[in-house]
Structures are given as C-alpha cells and as structure tokens.
Amino acid sequence: MNEIKKKQIAILGSTGSIGTQALQVIEEHPELYEVYALTANNKVDLLIAQARKFMPEAVVIANEEKYAQLKEALSDLPVKVYAGAAALCQIVESGPIDVVLTAMVGYAGLKPTMNAIRAGKAIALANKETLVVAGELINQLARQYRTPILPVDSEHSAVFQCLAGEVGNPIEKVILTASGGPFRTCTMEQLKTVTKVQALKHPNWEMGAKITIDSASMMNKGFEVIEAKWLFGVQPSQIEVVVHPQSVIHSMVQFEDGAIKAQLGMPDMRLPIQYAFSYPDRINSSFDRLDFSKCTNLTFEQPDTKRFRNLALAYESMYRGGNMPCIVNAANEVVVAAFLRDEISFLGMSDVIEHTMGQVSFVQTPTYDDYVATDAEARRIARELICK
C-alpha cells in the first residue's frame, strides 16, 4: 500500500494567533501534514520553540536584528535560517511547498502572497489585507497561474463551504455575520471613552491585538466585505452584514430561489484552517462540537454604522474602487497602532481614516507600484493627522 504523500505547508506568521492554531491542526494530523517553513516578524523565542518542535526545512525572521539570536539557537539543528523581507518572499517559492498559509498581519502579507501565487502554491488565505489592498491584482494572478485561494477567515470559509455543490447557481446575496464586538451595546457617549484594555476583550474569539481592535471598531467586518467581493465575484450591493452576537452561524449564502445555506459551528479558528488544508476533503478533528440544546437564543440585528463608522467607510471604499481600499487599510493600520499606544481615541480612529481617504491621490486602475506608493502616502498622512 502506497504511503500518502504529506502536504508540505509554509506558515507565514507562525507565532501569531492563526499560525499557532494552524500548528495545532498539523500536530493533530502528522500523517497528512508536515511543516516546511515557519516565519515570524519579531517573536523570536516562540519561533525557536516552534522550530525545535516541528523541525521545518527553514525558518525566516522578518526583523533582521533577531537573526543572530535565531541562528545561534538553532545551530544544532538541520534547519536553514534566514532573515528579512526578501527572504520572506523567496521562501514561499521553495519547490516542495504545497500550501502557503498567509497568517501574517497587515499589508506586509501582500508581496509574499503574490510570490507564492506566481510559484503555483495553493494559498490558505488568512491575511485579509492582501485582498483588501489589491484584490483585483491578486485575482488576476491567481487566474493566470491557476492557483487556488482557499479562505481561512471563519466567515469566508463558511461562504466557501455553502457554495460547495452550487457551481452555476447564481448567488443573490452573501450574508456575513458579525459578533458586534465588545462595544455592541455601547452608546456613542460611552464609545468616546473606551480604552484599549476594554477593546482587547472580544466576547467570542481568541485573536491577535490588531484584529481584535479591528473587530471592536467593525473595520474587520468592513475588510471582510471587501474580501468577499473578490473571493466570490459578487457586487458590493450583494454583500450584507448582520450582527449575530453568539457567533454560531458563521455566514450564509442566499440563492436566486430565496433558499439560504448557512454554516454553523463552535467559534474555533482551527476548523476553517483545517478545511483549507484538507479541501476538498473533510477529515476528523477533536474540536468541540456544537450542542443545539444549548443554543436556545440565536439573535440577529442590523449593524449601526453611525456608531461604527468604519464599516460604512469600508463599504464606501469598495464602491469607489481603485486604490481606495488600500488607502483605508493603510490608515487603519496606523490608527490601530496609535490606539494601542494610547495616542488616539476609539472614535478618533474613524475620523483619521475618513480624512486620509480625502487627501491621498486616487488611482482608478492601480498597478502594484501604485499600491506601494498609495500605502506609503496614506500612512504618512494618517500619522500627520494623528499628530495634529
């Protein structure tokens, strides 16, 4: 009997929330998956521990100042050690890699993802900013190189699963669910004084700091709307957000006959990660199962875009197109970092994003170089607005 060839997986951002959970999935299925490469930005100690445990072919630390420490710590192992942004982009092109999990945070994920697509690697996409910033470009590349993009976001994985077996059946509407975050019931007055400590307490999901703040401000949901447009080929008007505080229904698809398919489950990111790895197959897992006898109260409500303006700004950027979503992403990365440093208020983040949208040069059909220039200009303007 032939031995099953293990899928070789590269994890970009292995020390973050998604990356560490992906390693749990791999650990649970050592007969199916093998870690080929691990990368991190700064968390060198955790990267060292992961490398010693999973014995990848290579590791990359983006922060070059940490290279010597990483190299020394792994000197007794047959693991190649690299550092810097260029190495990050090159490692994804390695021949044996089957799947690249893009779990790094923010705009930094764009270039490595493009390189992985050009190298013909299946993309398990957890870095939503890649499609927010350059969705059209990424889709063109994926078509050109016949590379599958498998969504890892729980909402997009849910939609992806709902679309299984529906080839050729027109989508009427994609319905993305949102928990509403920790401030769902706060008044505008209360939102003026919320702190980063409060914002970092998400009611349902365990996530990294940046995405947790984005969830609190609903920018995360705005980005997911843009991501859905590119992943599923729907118009902005076909994407609806509904607040579902229990996070049991992960998203839904309504078809032209009015039928709605939904994907349900426990709020556990390992499930969509595993599905992206195993697609089109499903494999067993030890994850907690949903107990319907305990789901006695599933509720739904409309999002309030007056209190959570970021969602409206994301929709506006999607309707305007061009480099506008790139502008929003860059400004958002700057304001979230400032909020985490206590340099801007929670509501002030939306003000800076909106003003940045009005000041950065608009490009209707941007190239990759345009995106790079837009990102730099938007960050500069957002920082200037914060300092005013």
Swiss-Prot record:
This is 1-deoxy-D-xylulose 5-phosphate reductoisomerase. It comes from the Bacteria. Catalyzes the NADPH-dependent rearrangement and reduction of 1-deoxy-D-xylulose-5-phosphate (DXP) to 2-C-methyl-D-erythritol 4-phosphate (MEP). InterPro entries: DXP_reductoisomerase (IPR003821), DXP_reductoisomerase_C (IPR013644), DXP_reductoisomerase_N (IPR013512), DXPR_C (IPR026877), DXPR_C_sf (IPR036169), NAD(P)-bd_dom_sf (IPR036291). One of its GO terms (biological process) is isopentenyl diphosphate biosynthetic process, methylerythritol 4-phosphate pathway involved in terpenoid biosynthetic process. It comes from Bacteroides fragilis (strain ATCC 25285 / DSM 2151 / CCUG 4856 / JCM 11019 / LMG 10263 / NCTC 9343 / Onslow / VPI 2553 / EN-2). It catalyses: 2-C-methyl-D-erythritol 4-phosphate + NADP(+) = 1-deoxy-D-xylulose 5-phosphate + NADPH + H(+). Belongs to the DXR family. The gene is dxr. Its EC number is 1.1.1.267. 1-deoxy-D-xylulose 5-phosphate binds at K128, S154, E155, S179, H202, S215, N220, K221, E224. One of its GO terms (molecular function) is manganese ion binding. SUPFAM superfamilies: 1-deoxy-D-xylulose-5-phosphate reductoisomerase, C-terminal domain, Glyceraldehyde-3-phosphate dehydrogenase-like, C-terminal domain, NAD(P)-binding Rossmann-fold domains. Its cofactor is Mg(2+); Mn(2+). Keywords: Isoprene biosynthesis, Manganese, Metal-binding, NADP, Oxidoreductase. NADPH binds at T15, G16, S17, I18, N127, E129, G208.
